[in-house]
Amino acid sequence: MRRFLPLIILLSVIFLFLFGTFKKNTRVIPTPLIGQEVPVLGLEVAFYEDFEANNLVEILKSDKIKIINFWASWCLPCEVEHPILMGLSKKSDFIIIGVNYKDTEEGSAKFLNEKGNPYDLVVIDDEGMMGIEMGLTGVPETFVVNEDGKI
């Protein structure tokens, strides 16, 4: 029995390791923000269309669903995602807010002028502070905010 003890311990460790790795879904990144209000900082509004309100706080109070999309002109996946956002922008059921992440206003304006602007409002997060508050893991990243202002 004693000669099988190391084998039993080794198999137990392997089983526990495998059980722990199969249990987690690595495609889902948990966030404590679900059910919380959007953390809003004093970000500069670059441009907006068809809104009386020209600041993010007022628009987040709107009774429409909001889509907050973090993007940058230097981001290749953002370029791939852009036609999808352009298609969504043709629907009027929600507000699309673009957060230009760690980019220049010139770069973002050039990107939107060349490819089209799907956003109802664009804010500049050049230092990445809103991205930090939202738990951003990279760009592009999109959040859906309900009519009550909750993520």
Predicted regions and their residues:
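Thiol/disulfide oxidoreductase modules built on the thioredoxin-like
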Residues: F4, N113-P118, D125-I151
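Short pre-active-site segment immediately N-terminal to redox-active cysteine/selenocysteine motifs
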Residues: K64-K66, F70-W74, G138
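Conserved redox-active cysteine motifs that mediate thiol-disulfide chemistry
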Residues: F70-G87
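Conserved segment of the thioredoxin-like fold in thiol-based oxidoreductases
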Residues: K90-E127, V139
